[in-house]
């Protein structure tokens, strides 16, 4: 681009900015708000990584038709004015602000116009940390509901700029269900997901090479369901479950989802075999949600004694357990350790995950069961 073209581009951009600013309402005769600020998503008083995309939001207070948002840091600031109730930050200015304010706190003030009156809400904080998150997150896109579904995709999204791409689309697999996608070591070079129905299987990706696997043998009650990769990528640990949805007749309760039977098994992707232990394949015990420790020496999972179902579903409580695993020989340990006892704690553990550095284990505690889609976790 020559100098004349660059000059024209700069002038056009300045004119556009001036027009946008002139068209955007500016607060005047501002009064303090007498009610709490309602945002969606709820971004008030949160800690954010320095590489996150703009925290755009909606002001959900009734009757808002214009907003002004001021973000002030120690050395830089950003302000936007917009019609409607949506606050959208320019990506370039947002990135510059976060880069300048690493390790500092941003003060965010929202002023909104309602019925011709400008109201200023109490400020809240965004703490900017110098640490970066991995740039990509994968998720399953499906219509909300629990009876029927149609379009289904597994997608990847960049948390730095909102860009997305489709990894798998059931419109290309005769409408088959796809679920339980997992990445190993937070890497795109090691991943898998289950393709259900006739001709289905587990689709394994290792360094861009795809394989369809049947992760089931005669000792297992079902094909693989919930799973995790061993750090070396050779093994995966899975539960096999018979999952039952049960609808309530009470108006304030909608749905229960529970396992009638469930066991664990390890898949040896190189040896093309499933490895089962009698300690985690007991018909009197339900085992589910297995995950490897960061060093691969332990398998953490949830375990509950079987109870009559559905009548005793609220007495179904899972403990947090672990068992050793020897990756050199592909063998399970010879004892089970209980780390969090459901009977003593009067709760139920689900979804354990080990931190990559091996220092922490994250899990959720429910009142009972392991499905939190229609029940609330206990405050603990």
Where do the protein language model's features map onto the residues?
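C-terminal motif of bacterial Sec signal peptides marking the signal peptidase cleavage site
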Residues: 21-22
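Blade-terminus and WD-like Trp-Asp/Gly-His loop motifs, strongest in beta-propeller folds
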Residues: 129-132, 182-190, 227-235, 291-298, ...
């Amino acid at each position: 681009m020559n100098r004349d073209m660059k000059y024209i581009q700069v002038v056009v951009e300045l004119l556009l900015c001036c027009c946008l600013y002139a068209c955007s309402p500016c607060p005047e005769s501002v009064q303090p708000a007498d009610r709490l600020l309602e945002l969606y998503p709820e971004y008030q008083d949160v800690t954010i990584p320095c590489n996150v995309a703009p925290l755009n939001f909606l002001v959900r207070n009734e009757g808002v038709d214009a907003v002004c948002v001021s973000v002030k840091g120690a050395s830089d600031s950003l302000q936007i004015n917009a019609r409607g109730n949506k606050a959208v930050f320019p990506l370039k200015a947002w990135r510059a602000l976060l880069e300048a304010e690493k390790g500092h706190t941003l003060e965010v003030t929202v002023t909104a116009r309602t019925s011709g009156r400008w109201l200023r809400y109490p400020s809240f904080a965004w703490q900017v940390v110098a640490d970066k998150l991995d740039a990509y997150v994968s998720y399953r896109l499906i219509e909300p509901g629990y009876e029927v579904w149609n379009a289904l995709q597994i997608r990847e999204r960049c948390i730095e700029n909102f860009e997305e791409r489709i990894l798998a689309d059931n419109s290309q697999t005769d409408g088959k269900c796809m679920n339980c996608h997992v990445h190993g070591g937070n890497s795109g070079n090691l991943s898998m997901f289950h393709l259900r129905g006739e001709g289905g299987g587990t689709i394994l990706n290792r360094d861009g090479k795809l394989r369809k696997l049947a992760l089931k043998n005669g000792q297992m009650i079902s094909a693989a369901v919930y799973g995790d990769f061993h750090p070396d990528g050779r093994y995966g640990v899975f539960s096999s479950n018979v999952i039952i949805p049960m609808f309530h007749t009470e108006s304030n309760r909608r749905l229960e989802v529970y396992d009638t039977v469930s066991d664990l098994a390890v898949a040896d992707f190189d040896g093309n075999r499933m490895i089962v232990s009698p300690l985690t394949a007991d018909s009197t015990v339900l085992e589910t949600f297995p995950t490897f420790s960061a060093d691969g020496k332990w398998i953490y999972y949830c375990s509950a004694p079987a109870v009559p179902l559905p009548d005793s579903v609220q007495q179904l409580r899972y403990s947090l357990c672990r068992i050793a695993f020897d990756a050199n020989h592909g063998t399970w340990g010879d004892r089970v350790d209980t780390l969090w006892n459901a009977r003593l704690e009067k709760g139920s553990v689900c979804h354990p995950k080990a931190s990559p550095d091996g220092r922490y284990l994250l899990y959720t505690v429910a009142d009972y069961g392991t499905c939190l889609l229609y029940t609330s976790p206990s405050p603990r």
